[in-house]
Amino acid sequence: MPIVLITGGSGFLGTYLTERFLADGHTVRILDVLPPEKVSTGVEFIQGDVRDSEIVAKASAGVNVIVHNAALVPLSKSGDAFRDVNVRGTSVMLKAAIDAKINKFIFVSSSSVYGVPNNSDPITEETAQNPFEAYGISKAEAETLCQNAKDALDVSIIRPRTILGPGRMGLMSLLFDWVETNHRIYILGNGNNRYQLVAAEDVAEAVSLASRLPCRGQDFNVGADRFGTLREDLEQFCRAVGNKSKIVGVPSWLARATLPILGLLRLSPLVSYQYRIADKTVYFSTEKLKTILSFTPKYSNSEMLTRAYRWYKDHPTDPNSASLHRKKMNAGILRLLKYVP
């Protein structure tokens, strides 16, 4: 039975990747600093850091496929540590994969490598990268390492938009709290921008296909195939869950003037990438995904929001969870918005 190693397999996306590869008939080996919430049949867990070459070599032994998904995420606000984990960790993983003669190496990157779009055109794999914050820069550098290794290793890159699905909390917990109480929903700008999301299941499917189909040296942008403007998607979501919240736009200039200061004072959980693109049209073309992997993402933006919200209602989250994507966000001063009439 083929073995796939998934780094960061205990986190939000890692859980979906594990389920996908188990369904494909693989044995799954997870390498993570944290144990998974549950260990299913067919799953082996190794606790360790992707920067530890000895542990990485042990985890890579006998593996057919490596999915390198481990990373420090933006909500951690980890500064210089982004490069240490996301770049150096990728370098260690690539070396281990080459030494172990792995059949396939897939790197899970991020849409943040493109920075803030300067127009409303769809982002393609040929669009120039222009990251501006530590997380996006670290992901772009890690991508370069992967591309440089493609002569020695069958490597592909999966680049998701903002990932959503049942089990995802983080920033979404603030939105869902407003919806649950029929409170106003605050957005940056007027909401007429197209803002694409992607379902965790669709990302996992793209990774699975890239592990099986010939796509050496290829990168794939992955995002929803069906979505409208931010306002349209939120309105459709609210109707689906029987919510009567009013969507209220906050002037973008005001948010961009105040949020950096609040961030420095540790009063806001938002990072610069989030509030600099929130009112922009940001979406991937999925043509390459459809052409080479013959895959069309299944879920629309509003369907993702609806499914994630219903999960939120049915599953109280663990406030002590170490995964920043799987526990409610500390809203900081933003929690006061709930009391604005």
Annotate each PLM feature.
Residues 143-166:
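Conserved beta-loop-beta element that borders a ligand/cofactor-binding pocket
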